[in-house]
Amino acid sequence: KKIRKTNIDRMKNIGKGIHMLSTDIGVDLGTASILVYIKGKGVVLKEPSVVAFDRDTNKIKAIGEEARLMLGRTPGNIVAVRPLRQGVISDYRVTEKMLKYFIQKAIGKRMLKKPRISVCVPSGVTEVEKKAVEDATLQAGAREVAIIEEPIAAAIGAGIDISRPCGNMIVDIGGGTTDIAVISLGGTVVSTSIKIAGDDFDEAIVRYMRKKHNLLIGERTAEDIKIKVGSAYPRTEIATMNVRGRNLVTGLPKTVEVTSEETQEALKEATSQIVEAVHSVLEKTPPELASDIADRGIVLTGGGSLLQGLEELIESKTGIHTMTAEDPMTAVAIGTGKFIEFLAGYRDDK
């Protein structure tokens, strides 16, 4: 009963903040990627959260995919940066310009009325960090802004009916943060947010290649290794790929073969921390909801959940069936866009 009251009160408060708001756009403002969802059209834009600018003039040269291709390949005066770090804004000015660019690209410049935008944030952010996201979105051209916690958005996007009085567990692994939450009656009952996610997988691979093979590789190469042979759990067949980088001893280009077994070793520390965080949330979950989760399983969302073997690792360590959402990359964006419809439906039911 106590849980019911807490979550209904929370939903009433959210409702007041965006009274009768039928949002036009949902934005998944991720550390690695930005996705834009428009009602009736679905996800219309997915681009890397990267901006390239000239250090001498401070002018922006490229945004999104074009800027990502410049990472590690720019002349000295042009810098490619990620204005969001671990789920929060690290460079306000650049984030605002990036948001404005993506919103205009998604809706076109012909729209006469400013859009209403819902944006998601990690569950562990402070009120100050939430305010920064809200302000940046308003400055980028929003008429009204609604802020939504990522696990709630992920659950809606994964097709879970969050309004029901039963426990659902979501593990949303993005680029900068992993958000883990138990959701019931439209609210978060227990949650945690850790700053270990997809970017940390890439960094762990860079460190491993340097230490094990004396090979210096860039961010894009590390991501490529993660996608092609990355593993969190032993594969039935070992996968291999050739990786080019710079030999740290000779300074010359060098090619080495990397196996999925090696990536499992490289990623062990990061994946173990995610498993520990899942354990921690399960330990704090009320017994009735824990029973629901044991029946319904754990749902993974976010780009980081695509790491091969992550489902098996979590399932083997918790004993609870673990599955990845149908389209984990877009679940948060879809849920962010649909959240307001959910609130409107909730008020109609009252």
What feature does the model see in each segment?
Residues 1-173, 181-299, 305-350:
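Nucleotide/phosphate-binding catalytic cleft detector across ATP-hydrolyzing
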